[in-house]
A protein has these predicted regions:
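A cross-kingdom marker of C-terminal helix-rich interaction/assembly modules
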Residues: 1-54, 110-122, 162-328
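Helix-boundary capping/turn motifs
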Residues: 59-67
Length: 328
């Protein structure tokens, strides 16, 4: 996602050249404090709107990644309050607005132009509206419909979900909470103040939800940027497949149908480079295989290097939608 931001800056998505009539030029020069507002009233409204949406997309994505990085670093250091306080904005607010932008660009711009303080406050959106926006964004992605709008809403917004992130967001920002039984601060306690940083229970309940939200975020950002940048949807689809393979290995119970499918597709390509012993991707070795692109042979002990993206290309495995697929 950071690479996409660099590509966007290099492509001059933030600038444009326009030819205005003499009357439009006079209006533009007479209102130097609001050039965008003036341009929106000219014959170049469509171009100006595209420029403004590009600015919004880039600024929101950059801000989201800044908070996300610092939040994840804080969690890795077991600074729970700081981590969840920082993650609240990118996951609860920014990601929702980017979802709306991908789902319905016209509606997003209408609300943005009329005043975000009125139409874009989170409290203005009911749960069913949020789910509808998430569904629209999922449908508009470059990749297959892999995510659940209900699960996203319940994870990020539902304060009655004991396994969601919404409770932790509130507890990290407030010493005392009382919304419901799940959120109510216990007697003789303050939220997180007396939490033992060595306890791992927070990671057990939140990392699966964070991983799911981050995969969704990747789908949103790549799909939005594809509207203005040339993006290889097959490459994106293979990256998402790798993410889901690791996610299944780390967080899903029982056997993984996805790993079985990958093993079958790779076939004879998956073998030791020294003794040619066939390899099988299992939950125990899948994270290292897909992230480090290596697997240790149980027969000879050699550590074989595998070019994962090349293998996926040879096996024709990808979660990308066909190029001619229209949103359903």
């Amino acid at each position: 996602m950071l690479h996409l931001l660099r590509e966007a800056d290099a492509s001059h998505m933030r600038s444009m050249e326009v030819d205005l009539t003499s009357e439009e030029q006079q209006a533009f020069l007479a209102t130097p404090e609001d050039p965008i507002g003036v341009l929106l009233q000219t014959s170049k409204r469509v171009e100006t709107k595209r420029l403004l949406l590009n600015h919004v997309m880039l600024a929101l994505t950059a801000d989201m990644l800044d908070f996300l990085y610092d939040g994840l670093i804080a969690l890795s250091k077991r600074k729970y309050v700081v981590g969840f306080a920082l993650l609240r904005k990118p996951l609860r607010e920014t990601l929702f607005y980017l979802s709306l932008l991908l789902s319905d660009e016209e509606e997003f711009f209408r609300l943005f132009e009329n005043g975000p303080a009125h139409g874009l406050r989170l409290r203005e959106f009911r749960p069913d509206q949020r789910k509808s926006i998430f569904s629209g964004a999922i449908n508009a992605m470059l990749i297959d419909d892999l995510f659940s709008a209900t699960h996203l809403n319940d994870t990020v917004f539902d304060k009655s979900n004991p396994n969601g992130l919404a409770i932790l967001f509130d507890q990290a920002n407030h010493l005392v909470t009382s919304f419901n039984a799940n959120l109510k601060t216990d007697s003789l306690n303050f939220n997180f103040v007396f939490k033992n940083p060595e306890d791992d229970d927070v990671f057990h309940t939140t990392y699966p939800q964070l991983a799911y939200a981050l995969m969704y975020m990747f789908g949103i950002v790549t799909s939005l940027f594809s509207r203005t940048l040339p993006i290889d949807r097959e490459y994106v689809g293979r990256l998402v497949l790798i993410m889901f393979a690791v996610y299944h290995s780390l967080f899903c119970r029982g056997s993984s149908g996805l790993l079985r499918q990958i093993n079958l597709a790779f076939g004879e390509l998956l073998k030791c480079s020294v003794c040619e012993m066939p390899f099988v991707i299992r939950k125990s070795n899948a994270p290292r295989f897909f992230v480090a692109e290596r697997m240790v042979c149980k027969r000879c002990g050699s550590d074989t290097d595998f070019p994962i993206l090349w293998l996926l290309g040879q096996a024709k495995l990808s979660f990308a939608k066909p190029a001619d697929a229209s949103p359903r």
